[in-house]
């Protein structure tokens, strides 16, 4: 059973819109110097999914242009794996093992919640190294 303080924070998180949840993740990353782009990826999506589920219950919001994009590593040719691995390490700051796990587990998100321009730059770098990349 969570403490009263934790329960209150949890209730506030449930009320966040998807955009607010994205802003929260960015603020946490900057404040604590961590990255939400985990190699496993499962827990990263838990908060936005919960926020998305809670959002329809709220009043409809005006349609906004997408401002946060996910860069997905779709495919890695075997002969280009080392070059792609180097680019992934450069872009994400991951260690060798984590970057290798990410590259070998394609399709996987390389970066999540980035601006359109940054997403396009990341896509270009990965494609130049030989990867197949998609932006969502």
Curated annotation (Swiss-Prot):
Stored Gene3D superfamilies: 3.30.1390.10, Single helix bin
Keyword Ribonucleoprotein set for record: yes
InterPro entries tied to this protein: Ribosomal_bL12 (IPR000206), Ribosomal_bL12_C (IPR013823), Ribosomal_bL12_C/ClpS-like (IPR014719), Ribosomal_bL12_oligo (IPR008932), Ribosomal_bL12_oligo_N_sf (IPR036235)
GO molecular function, one term: mRNA binding
DNA repair is among the record's keywords: no
Gene Ontology CC, one term: cytosolic large ribosomal subunit
UniProt keyword terms in alphabetical order: Ribonucleoprotein, Ribosomal protein
Pfam families noted in UniProt: Ribosomal_L12, Ribosomal_L12_N
GO BP terms in the entry: translation
Top-rank taxon, per record: Bacteria
Stated role: Forms part of the ribosomal stalk which helps the ribosome interact with GTP-bound translation factors. Is thus essential for accurate translation.
Family listed: Belongs to the bacterial ribosomal protein bL12 family.
PANTHER family (alphabetical): 39S RIBOSOMAL PROTEIN L12, LARGE RIBOSOMAL SUBUNIT PROTEIN BL12M
Description of how the protein assembles with itself and partners: Homodimer. Part of the ribosomal stalk of the 50S ribosomal subunit. Forms a multimeric L10(L12)X complex, where L10 forms an elongated spine to which 2 to 4 L12 dimers bind in a sequential fashion. Binds GTP-bound translation factors.
UniProt name for this protein: Large ribosomal subunit protein bL12
Gene: rplL
């Amino acid at each position: 059973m969570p403490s009263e303080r934790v329960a209150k924070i949890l209730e506030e998180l449930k009320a966040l819109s998807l955009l607010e949840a994205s802003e929260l993740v960015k603020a946490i990353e900057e404040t604590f110097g961590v990255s939400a782009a985990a190699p496993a990826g499962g827990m990263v999506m838990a908060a936005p999914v919960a926020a998305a589920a809670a959002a329809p219950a709220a009043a409809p919001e005006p349609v906004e242009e997408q401002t946060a994009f996910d860069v997905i590593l779709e495919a890695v040719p075997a002969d280009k794996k080392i070059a792609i691995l180097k680019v992934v390490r450069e872009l994400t700051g991951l260690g060798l093992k984590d970057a290798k796990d990410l590259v070998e587990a394609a399709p996987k998100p390389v970066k999540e919640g980035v601006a359109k321009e940054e997403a396009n730059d990341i896509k270009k770098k990965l494609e130049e190294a030989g990867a197949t990349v998609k932006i969502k």
